[in-house]
A protein has these predicted regions:
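Short beta-strand-turn/beta-hairpin segments enriched in glycine/proline and small hydrophobics
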Residues: 20-40, 64, 69-71
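Short, conserved beta-turn/loop elements at beta-strand boundaries and strand-helix junctions
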Residues: 20-23, 82-89, 113
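A structural signal for short beta-strand/turn segments enriched in small hydrophobics and glycine
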Residues: 50-65, 106
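Short, flexible surface segments
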Residues: 14, 22, 48-49, 55, ...
C-alpha cells in the first residue's frame, strides 16, 4: 500500500479538490478555477448522506448566473456528511474554498482511486496557470 499523507490535496480533471482526511475519508469541494468559471452561484443541490457514489457520477448540481454544472465524483464511496450551509447560502463557495467551504465528505470504497488524481503542480499545469 502506498503511503498518502493525511491532509494532502488532490485534484480531478473536473475541477474538484479532494482533501485526504485519513486513509479512507476525504472531503470534496470545487476548485477556485471552477468557481471563477461559474461566476456567482445561486443554487447548490447536494446528495443525501448514505448515498453511494462511483467515480464519474454526477453527485451535485451547481447553478450560477452564467450556467449550471455538475459536481462529478472524483472518487467512489459512501457520502457520510454534506455541507448543508451551501444549500442555504451558495455564495459561501466564493469566500474560502478549501478550509471552510466543502461540499461532501466521502468514506472511500476504493482508496487507490486517489492515485489517479492530480497533485497541485499538475493541476496548475492542467488549467494553464
Amino acid at each position: 500500500m502506498l503511503f498518502r499523507s493525511v491532509m494532502s490535496v488532490k485534484y480531478s480533471e473536473d475541477h474538484a479538490w479532494v482533501k485526504v482526511q485519513d486513509e479512507d475519508l476525504v472531503t470534496i469541494g470545487i476548485t477556485d478555477f471552477a468557481q471563477e468559471q461559474l461566476g456567482d452561484l445561486v443554487y447548490i443541490e447536494l446528495p443525501k448522506v448514505g448515498h453511494e457514489c462511483s467515480r464519474g457520477d454526477n453527485i451535485s448540481v451547481i447553478e450560477s448566473v452564467k450556467s449550471a454544472s455538475d459536481l462529478v465524483a472524483p472518487v467512489s464511496g459512501e457520502i457520510v456528511e454534506v455541507n448543508d450551509r451551501l444549500e442555504d447560502d451558495p455564495e459561501l463557495v466564493s469566500e474560502d474554498l478549501m478550509d471552510e467551504v466543502w461540499f461532501i465528505k466521502v468514506k472511500l470504497s476504493n482508496p487507490s482511486e486517489l492515485d489517479e488524481l492530480m497533485n497541485e503542480e499538475t493541476y496548475q499545469t492542467f488549467i494553464g496557470d
